[in-house]
Amino acid sequence: MVTQDLKKFSTPVFPFTAIVGQEEMKLALQLNVIDPKIGGVMIMGDRGTGKSTTIRAIADLLPEIEVVKDDPFNSHKSDLDLMGNEIKLAIQNGESLETELIKIPMVDLPLGATEDRVCGTIDIEKALTEGVKAFEPGLLAKANRGILYVDEVNLLDDHLVDILLDSAASGWNTVEREGISIRHPARFVLVGSGNPEEGELRPQLLDRFGMHAEIRTVKDPILRVKVVEERTSFDQTPMVWIENYEKQQQELRDRIVLAQKVLPTVELDYDLRVKISEVCSQLDVDGLRGDIVTNRAAKAHAAYHGRDKVTVEDIAKIITLCLRHRLRKDPLETIDSGNKVSKVFNEIFEIEE
């Protein structure tokens, strides 16, 4: 009863299915939710284009997850990669674990956050006097099995971005202080957003994001009017608005859950894998991250459409998102908008433009 009352008073979130346009950003977010191993998404675009609204909307859309009750790491009751050490010990000792359903964690990382706030801290005094590892979890612990959102990621300290990307890639966070070490699961979808006018990310950091979506302000006057009207209507009667979209929200929720189940069975033919690597090679992409992410994203896209085999159309839809930020570019150029990727893709896959 208390939980239901709290839901009534929680801040209403604009429905994901009601968002007009910005298909590239919406697709990238959905694919990362289907397969978090894609490695997150970097969203770059103009101010006021709905970046934050869309990211909060996808978190609100997702189904609840089962976690061990009162556990700071949102531990899974059976998956060893998603549980903290205390839960592992409890299972080894044969203790029964109480679980609860919670909404997917959506953690905002403020620009002024310190390393201790992000990673967590160890109480050295307690460790020395009482001999216990007293750990105060940080934002990475909170974000386990959820979404970690960094607005204006291009303005965040580089060493903090490094920490976030390392945790997102490995799924673990390690805190070392005064010879004491603590490790806990930190598997999350990392979503960064920013405005290119305020500065770019270093290429090494950009490369670590699985996908890169670019969004532009809507130019069509009729679409602009629609966006303004829908936002005004939502602000006036949010609960009515949310109820109107509940059916579409549930349909998309079911589709994402089904895609997550189908994903392990999706196949990508050897010939297509070779062609993906040919595209990466011809574009002179450094390293192999581009190949790996494109393979994963293509499988997630096929699963999203209910197929168990990747098609050329699946690859065509995602390859620009996966590669555009990995190209070597002239310092005077703005980041490649994807034309170069599309051109090489069409050549290698023999598609007429």
Swiss-Prot record:
The keyword ATP-binding applies. GO terms for molecular function: ATP binding; ATP hydrolysis activity; magnesium chelatase activity. Keywords: ATP-binding, Chlorophyll biosynthesis, Chloroplast, Ligase, Nucleotide-binding, Photosynthesis, Plastid. InterPro entries: AAA+_ATPase, CHLI-like, ChlI/MoxR_AAA_lid, Mg_chelatase_ATPase-isu, Mg_chelatse_chII-like_cat_dom, P-loop_NTPase. ATP binds at G45, D46, R47, G48, T49, G50, K51, S52. GO terms for cellular component: chloroplast. It comes from the Eukaryota. Its main location: plastid. It is found in: Plastid, Chloroplast. GO terms for biological process: chlorophyll biosynthetic process; photosynthesis. Pfam families: AAA_lid_2 (PF17863), Mg_chelatase (PF01078). SUPFAM superfamilies: P-loop containing nucleoside triphosphate hydrolases. It catalyses: protoporphyrin IX + Mg(2+) + ATP + H2O = Mg-protoporphyrin IX + ADP + phosphate + 3 H(+). Its EC number is 6.6.1.1. The keyword Lipid metabolism does not apply. Pathway: Porphyrin-containing compound metabolism; chlorophyll biosynthesis. Belongs to the Mg-chelatase subunits D/I family. Involved in chlorophyll biosynthesis; introduces a magnesium ion into protoporphyrin IX to yield Mg-protoporphyrin IX. This is Magnesium-chelatase subunit ChlI. The gene is chlI.
